[in-house]
Protein backbone atom coordinates (compact mmCIF):
# COMPACT_ATOMS: atom_id res chain seq x y z
CA UNK A 1 0.00 0.00 0.00
CA UNK A 2 1.36 3.40 -0.98
CA UNK A 3 1.75 6.16 1.63
CA UNK A 4 -1.49 7.81 2.68
CA UNK A 5 -2.05 11.47 3.50
CA UNK A 6 -3.35 12.35 6.99
CA UNK A 7 -6.86 12.95 5.55
CA UNK A 8 -6.82 9.58 3.76
CA UNK A 9 -5.80 7.89 7.03
CA UNK A 10 -8.71 9.65 8.76
CA UNK A 11 -11.17 8.42 6.12
CA UNK A 12 -9.81 4.87 6.33
CA UNK A 13 -10.09 4.92 10.13
CA UNK A 14 -13.68 6.19 9.88
CA UNK A 15 -14.56 3.31 7.54
CA UNK A 16 -12.98 0.77 9.93
CA UNK A 17 -14.82 2.26 12.93
CA UNK A 18 -18.11 2.34 11.01
CA UNK A 19 -17.79 -1.34 10.03
CA UNK A 20 -16.87 -2.33 13.60
CA UNK A 21 -19.81 -0.38 15.04
CA UNK A 22 -22.60 -0.93 12.50
CA UNK A 23 -21.45 -4.00 10.55
CA UNK A 24 -21.33 -2.10 7.25
CA UNK A 25 -19.26 0.72 5.74
CA UNK A 26 -20.55 4.31 5.54
CA UNK A 27 -22.15 5.76 2.42
CA UNK A 28 -20.43 8.53 0.45
CA UNK A 29 -22.94 10.99 1.93
CA UNK A 30 -22.14 9.86 5.48
CA UNK A 31 -18.40 10.27 4.86
CA UNK A 32 -19.00 13.73 3.36
CA UNK A 33 -21.15 14.77 6.33
CA UNK A 34 -18.60 13.51 8.87
CA UNK A 35 -15.72 15.46 7.33
CA UNK A 36 -17.72 18.50 6.24
CA UNK A 37 -17.20 17.90 2.52
CA UNK A 38 -19.40 19.96 0.21
CA UNK A 39 -20.89 16.86 -1.46
CA UNK A 40 -20.69 13.05 -1.61
CA UNK A 41 -18.63 13.49 -4.81
CA UNK A 42 -15.74 14.80 -2.71
CA UNK A 43 -15.90 11.63 -0.60
CA UNK A 44 -16.01 9.56 -3.80
CA UNK A 45 -12.79 11.17 -5.05
CA UNK A 46 -11.02 10.33 -1.78
CA UNK A 47 -12.32 6.74 -1.98
CA UNK A 48 -11.09 6.35 -5.56
CA UNK A 49 -7.64 7.58 -4.52
CA UNK A 50 -7.61 5.15 -1.59
CA UNK A 51 -8.60 2.34 -3.98
CA UNK A 52 -5.75 3.25 -6.35
CA UNK A 53 -3.34 3.09 -3.42
CA UNK A 54 -4.63 -0.37 -2.48
CA UNK A 55 -6.08 0.73 0.87
CA UNK A 56 -9.61 -0.41 -0.01
CA UNK A 57 -11.72 -1.81 -2.83
CA UNK A 58 -14.81 -0.20 -4.34
CA UNK A 59 -17.76 -2.39 -5.36
CA UNK A 60 -19.67 -0.63 -8.13
CA UNK A 61 -23.43 -0.19 -7.93
CA UNK A 62 -23.74 -0.33 -4.13
CA UNK A 63 -24.13 2.74 -1.93
CA UNK A 64 -22.06 1.02 0.77
CA UNK A 65 -19.79 -0.73 -1.72
CA UNK A 66 -16.52 -0.32 0.18
CA UNK A 67 -14.45 -3.38 1.05
CA UNK A 68 -11.31 -3.33 3.19
CA UNK A 69 -8.60 -5.86 2.30
CA UNK A 70 -8.52 -8.67 4.82
CA UNK A 71 -11.40 -7.14 6.75
CA UNK A 72 -15.05 -6.39 6.52
CA UNK A 73 -15.80 -9.58 4.60
CA UNK A 74 -18.62 -9.90 2.10
CA UNK A 75 -21.84 -7.99 2.69
CA UNK A 76 -24.99 -10.03 3.26
CA UNK A 77 -27.54 -8.12 1.21
CA UNK A 78 -31.25 -8.48 1.83
CA UNK A 79 -33.05 -11.68 1.00
CA UNK A 80 -33.69 -13.26 -2.38
CA UNK A 81 -36.59 -15.56 -3.15
CA UNK A 82 -35.77 -19.04 -4.35
CA UNK A 83 -39.52 -19.63 -4.67
CA UNK A 84 -42.05 -16.94 -5.42
CA UNK A 85 -40.25 -13.61 -5.94
CA UNK A 86 -40.22 -11.33 -2.92
CA UNK A 87 -39.61 -7.59 -2.79
CA UNK A 88 -35.87 -6.98 -2.98
CA UNK A 89 -34.31 -5.34 0.06
CA UNK A 90 -30.94 -3.74 -0.68
CA UNK A 91 -30.20 -3.72 3.04
CA UNK A 92 -26.83 -4.90 4.23
CA UNK A 93 -27.66 -7.05 7.24
CA UNK A 94 -24.09 -7.92 8.24
CA UNK A 95 -20.69 -8.92 6.89
CA UNK A 96 -19.30 -12.44 6.70
CA UNK A 97 -15.58 -13.22 6.60
CA UNK A 98 -15.11 -15.23 3.42
CA UNK A 99 -12.07 -15.88 1.26
CA UNK A 100 -13.31 -14.44 -2.04
CA UNK A 101 -10.68 -16.53 -3.87
CA UNK A 102 -12.93 -19.54 -3.19
CA UNK A 103 -15.26 -18.31 -5.92
CA UNK A 104 -14.65 -17.93 -9.64
CA UNK A 105 -15.52 -15.42 -10.86
CA UNK A 106 -15.01 -13.56 -7.61
CA UNK A 107 -18.03 -13.04 -5.33
CA UNK A 108 -19.05 -9.40 -4.81
CA UNK A 109 -21.72 -9.96 -2.16
CA UNK A 110 -23.91 -12.58 -0.50
CA UNK A 111 -27.69 -12.83 -0.78
CA UNK A 112 -29.88 -14.72 1.66
CA UNK A 113 -32.05 -17.35 -0.03
CA UNK A 114 -35.68 -17.88 0.92
CA UNK A 115 -37.61 -20.85 -0.46
CA UNK A 116 -36.90 -24.26 -1.94
CA UNK A 117 -37.27 -23.74 -5.71
CA UNK A 118 -33.52 -24.39 -6.29
CA UNK A 119 -33.05 -27.23 -3.79
CA UNK A 120 -32.23 -29.88 -6.40
CA UNK A 121 -28.90 -28.16 -7.11
CA UNK A 122 -28.17 -27.58 -3.43
CA UNK A 123 -29.42 -24.01 -2.98
CA UNK A 124 -31.56 -24.27 0.13
CA UNK A 125 -33.76 -22.02 2.22
CA UNK A 126 -31.56 -19.89 4.50
CA UNK A 127 -28.37 -20.36 2.48
CA UNK A 128 -26.12 -17.45 1.58
CA UNK A 129 -25.74 -17.29 -2.18
CA UNK A 130 -22.38 -15.91 -3.34
CA UNK A 131 -23.04 -13.54 -6.25
CA UNK A 132 -20.73 -12.05 -8.87
CA UNK A 133 -22.18 -8.71 -9.93
CA UNK A 134 -22.99 -8.89 -13.66
CA UNK A 135 -25.64 -7.42 -15.93
CA UNK A 136 -25.35 -10.27 -18.43
CA UNK A 137 -25.90 -14.01 -18.24
CA UNK A 138 -25.36 -17.01 -20.49
CA UNK A 139 -27.92 -19.75 -21.03
CA UNK A 140 -27.84 -22.27 -18.21
CA UNK A 141 -26.30 -20.00 -15.59
CA UNK A 142 -27.99 -19.55 -12.21
CA UNK A 143 -28.80 -15.86 -11.89
CA UNK A 144 -30.19 -13.32 -9.49
CA UNK A 145 -32.86 -11.68 -11.65
CA UNK A 146 -35.02 -8.66 -10.91
CA UNK A 147 -38.49 -8.37 -12.41
CA UNK A 148 -39.75 -4.92 -11.54
CA UNK A 149 -38.92 -4.49 -7.85
CA UNK A 150 -38.81 -8.20 -7.08
CA UNK A 151 -35.88 -10.59 -7.21
CA UNK A 152 -35.56 -14.33 -7.63
CA UNK A 153 -32.85 -16.95 -8.04
CA UNK A 154 -33.35 -19.20 -11.07
CA UNK A 155 -31.57 -20.85 -14.01
CA UNK A 156 -31.47 -18.51 -17.02
CA UNK A 157 -32.66 -19.44 -20.52
CA UNK A 158 -33.39 -17.03 -23.36
CA UNK A 159 -34.97 -17.55 -26.77
CA UNK A 160 -35.66 -14.47 -28.86
CA UNK A 161 -37.42 -11.90 -26.68
CA UNK A 162 -38.58 -14.53 -24.16
CA UNK A 163 -36.65 -15.39 -21.01
CA UNK A 164 -37.41 -18.44 -18.91
CA UNK A 165 -36.27 -18.43 -15.29
CA UNK A 166 -36.23 -22.12 -14.45
CA UNK A 167 -36.54 -23.62 -10.96
CA UNK A 168 -34.57 -26.68 -9.87
CA UNK A 169 -37.50 -28.29 -8.08
CA UNK A 170 -40.38 -30.06 -9.85
CA UNK A 171 -42.89 -28.50 -7.42
CA UNK A 172 -42.29 -25.03 -8.93
CA UNK A 173 -43.22 -23.57 -12.31
CA UNK A 174 -40.83 -21.60 -14.54
CA UNK A 175 -41.19 -17.82 -14.62
CA UNK A 176 -41.66 -16.70 -18.23
CA UNK A 177 -40.78 -13.10 -19.07
CA UNK A 178 -41.71 -11.44 -22.36
CA UNK A 179 -39.02 -8.78 -22.72
CA UNK A 180 -41.34 -6.75 -24.97
CA UNK A 181 -43.82 -6.41 -22.11
CA UNK A 182 -41.80 -6.76 -18.92
CA UNK A 183 -38.47 -5.44 -17.72
CA UNK A 184 -35.96 -8.00 -16.51
CA UNK A 185 -32.59 -7.06 -15.02
CA UNK A 186 -29.80 -9.51 -14.27
CA UNK A 187 -28.36 -8.48 -10.90
CA UNK A 188 -25.64 -11.10 -10.83
CA UNK A 189 -24.46 -14.66 -11.40
CA UNK A 190 -24.47 -17.26 -8.62
CA UNK A 191 -20.91 -18.47 -8.00
CA UNK A 192 -21.33 -20.51 -4.82
CA UNK A 193 -23.31 -21.27 -1.69
CA UNK A 194 -22.43 -20.85 1.97
CA UNK A 195 -24.37 -22.89 4.49
CA UNK A 196 -23.94 -22.56 8.23
CA UNK A 197 -25.53 -23.74 11.44
CA UNK A 198 -26.85 -27.05 10.10
CA UNK A 199 -25.82 -30.41 11.49
CA UNK A 200 -25.06 -33.19 9.01
UniProtKB/Swiss-Prot annotation:
Coiled coil: none annotated. It catalyses: Hydrolysis of Ala-|-Gly bond in repressor LexA. Keywords: Autocatalytic cleavage, DNA damage, DNA repair, DNA replication, DNA-binding, Hydrolase, Repressor, SOS response, Transcription, Transcription regulation. NCBIfam families: lexA. Gene3D superfamilies: Umud Fragment, subunit A, Winged helix-like DNA-binding domain superfamily/Winged helix DNA-binding domain. This is LexA repressor. InterPro entries: LexA, LexA-like, LexA/Signal_pep-like_sf, LexA_DNA-bd_dom, LexA_repressor, Peptidase_S24_LexA, Peptidase_S24_S26A/B/C, WH-like_DNA-bd_sf. The gene is lexA. Homodimer. The lineage of its organism: Bacteria, Pseudomonadati, Pseudomonadota, Betaproteobacteria, Nitrosomonadales. PANTHER family: LEXA REPRESSOR, LEXA REPRESSOR-RELATED. The keyword rRNA-binding does not apply.
